[in-house]
Curated annotation (Swiss-Prot):
Record protein name field: Phenylalanine--tRNA ligase alpha subunit
Assembly and oligomerization: Tetramer of two alpha and two beta subunits.
UniProt keyword terms in alphabetical order: Aminoacyl-tRNA synthetase, ATP-binding, Cytoplasm, Ligase, Magnesium, Metal-binding, Nucleotide-binding, Protein biosynthesis
Iron-sulfur found in the keyword field: no
Organism: Nitratidesulfovibrio vulgaris (strain DSM 19637 / Miyazaki F)
Amino acid sequence: MDLLKELESLVPELERGLDQASSLTELEELRVAFLGRKGRLAQIMGRLPELSPEDRPRLGQAANGVKMALTERFEGRKTALEAASEAAALSRFDPTLPGRAPWRGSLHPDTLVMEEICSVFRGLGYDIVTGPEVEMDHYNFEALNMPAEHPARDMQDTLYVTESILMRTHTSPLQVRTMLARKPPVAIIAPGKVYRRDSDITHTPMFHQIEGLMVDKGVSMADLRGTLTSFLRNVFGGDTRVRFRPSFFPFTEPSAEVDISCCICGGKGHVGNEPCRVCKTTGWVEILGCGMVDPAVFTAVGYDPEEYTGFAFGLGVERVAMLKYGIGDLRMFFENDVRFLSQFS
């Protein structure tokens, strides 16, 4: 049977071709020639109708066996050529050389300071609250005892979206929102971004603040002093000295500015024989503002100022980071300079 002989000759013929194939391209050409849709095996199978009905099953069975043999030999040669190609590629460099570990980033100093502050206040039983950065004028000013045309609004260069919508200038609106949603006692801190129309070595249009609020029956200025002293010594060290100075904020009465002994000179006013550039030789640096919540704020949120008292405070995260890490220029926090940021890894 001529067709059977042609079929049986395909295997040794392919083997000779495989021995001569030196690349995957030549191997693919062989596959198409023998196993392709118009290849040698397909041509032989196309002549099956020429055979008698008795011979067709035998030739079909033989064709299946030949196809399996051709495929097996082809795959074997393909594996060998792929291994040779990979070995040739590897020969161009030394795979035993030690690898280079991927570069790892680090947390931003703002993030480090915010996490540390939040951790301290969590330990004191405070909740962490967040809210919208695009805020209503009512929550940002009016409910905080700063009605329209109040001169205290001039203390903050506000970015307005519309006449009644603005970019929040502090996170105090979250204190109002929380008091409207909860009944006393309330103990929260509100970290987040705030916005003001200002930009220089000590100011940026966007920065981070953390503001706190405690409301309950019998809360006093002594509680405020004790809380903030404990917090500041947790962040800046147990030897840190803390002092309170009278001040003014429209939503607290009485109000105070809080200073700490200078982190750079240790409160001495000088470093060696040089005057301290941070505290300007005073030995003190301003760190935050605070006070007892004004009764007008309680009235605005539906609290009875005759029954409840509370204190509030606020501080800039970048301010804390600058003092804690000795950073001289606020703008460095926002320039994404890896040389600066990698120091905090």
